[in-house]
Amino acid sequence: MRRQLLTYALLLAVMACPVWAQQAPMKLWYTQPAAHFEESLPLGNGRLGALVYGNPDDDALVLNDLTLWSGTPIDPDEDKGASRWIPEIRKALFAENYALADSLQLHVQGHNSAYYMPLVTLHIKDADACAFTNYRRELSLDSALAHVYYRKAGVNYQREYLASAPDQLVAVRLSASKRKSINVQLTLSSLLDHQVTTADGQLTLTGHAMGKADESTRFCSIVRVSHRDGTLTATDTSLVLIGVSEATVYFVNETSFNGFDRHPVRNGAPYMERAADRARQASRLMYDDLLVRHLADYRRFFSRVSLTLQPGVSSCYDDLPTDSLLRSYGTRSECDRYLETL
């Protein structure tokens, strides 16, 4: 009986508490597009990563893949006898014969490490390039969604970005307050050796990591689009949307990486077939279903822990964009706590 009374008392106490633990929005937000890498908004699903720059006229979405590296497997026994040079190197160092030590260390150095490679950049170019107002770019930490809002020629535009782990893709949803107001061109580029093709409403970029084509990890990036109203046409190297009310851009990628100890070409994974399968699956997706799966998966991890450093919901979120909060850190206690929570 005493235990039951204690349980009821605890429940009543919790119900009577004010909602001071409610968190302010867990968002980073800015009033201008990103001009540099450090200003972009990162998204990722554990394999694919994306950086959102958010320029309304030419939006760059810089993408990478966890498995895209330079180099090839190395024989683990290649430097098996390297340890015998260590005493000689130490002897040279103690004798301050640094030139000799430097030459001897070549016997134990082995091959250079592989380099992590950039993948591609997806450009969303607005055909109606003109002045924009009411700009806002944000990243929601509690949903792993990025947004860009702006106004052009009396029309409000919104772009929503996500990197889905369940569906292994990156998606961008374009919408506008006025029907048939979206006019954009989609292109793919890469700093690596590559070629771009279009077919059946699909944009494809294939290439390989730094090095010889027959020795390097290969990759295939595909963009597909679903849209409402308007038209979707293709040039040799781009997809063009005209008079569209709403569109979803799907990006998928696969590489020939097949394990750290397997050659990426001779024993590589079937990256072309896998990318084509991913693209076909993406084209059958409804964006709302994709979003629900993404949120359920992400929040399963993010919601395990929450942090509150102050009572009440801070007004600092609405008062100042994140870069201004950083510059004013140390001058407003309430805002400092909110920034630290972020």
Model region roles, listed by residue range:
Residues 22-342:
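Aromatic-residue-lined binding/catalytic grooves and analogous aromatic/hydrophobic interfacial grooves
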